Amino acid sequence: MFTLKKSMLLLFFLGTINLSLCQEERDAEEERRDEDNAKMEEIKRGILGTVFKAGKGIVCGLTGLC
């Protein structure tokens, strides 16, 4: 009976460690995705800002109202 309890305790302990490692890996993956999304948003903002400035310059040049 005692060896059965030790075996069950060992399995529980190893399972807990395994779940902990999986959670850490999942969190790291989410952080990588968040960083990638933030970079893409920053690139989009930069491109849109440039397009709006260029459009404003074109409208200003064509109409002469600056």
UniProtKB/Swiss-Prot annotation:
Subcellular location: Secreted
GO CC annotation terms, alphabetical: extracellular region
Signal peptide residues on this chain, from the entry's feature table: 1-22
Propeptide feature: residues: 23-43
Keyword Secreted: yes
TM helices/strands, residue ranges: none
Tagged with keyword Nucleus: no
Protein name per its UniProtKB record: Nigrocin-2ISb
Record function comment: Has antimicrobial activity against Gram-negative bacterium E.coli ATCC 8739 (MIC=50 ug), against Gram positive bacteria S.aureus ATCC 6538 (MIC=3.1 ug), methicillin-resistant S.aureus ATCC 43300 (MIC=12.5 ug), B.subtilis ATCC 6633 (MIC=12.5 ug) and against fungus C.albicans ATCC 90028 (MIC=50 ug).
InterPro entries for the chain: Frog_antimicrobial_propeptide, Nigrocin
Family of the protein in this entry: Belongs to the frog skin active peptide (FSAP) family. Brevinin subfamily.
Organism placement in taxonomy: Eukaryota, Metazoa, Chordata, Craniata, Vertebrata
A Pfam match: Antimicrobial22
Tissue: Expressed by the skin glands.
UniProt keywords, alphabetically: Amphibian defense peptide, Antibiotic, Antimicrobial, Cleavage on pair of basic residues, Disulfide bond, Fungicide, Secreted, Signal
Gene Ontology biological process terms, A to Z: defense response to fungus; defense response to Gram-negative bacterium; defense response to Gram-positive bacterium; killing of cells of another organism
Top-level division of the source organism's lineage: Eukaryota
Cysteine pairings via disulfide bonds: C60-C66
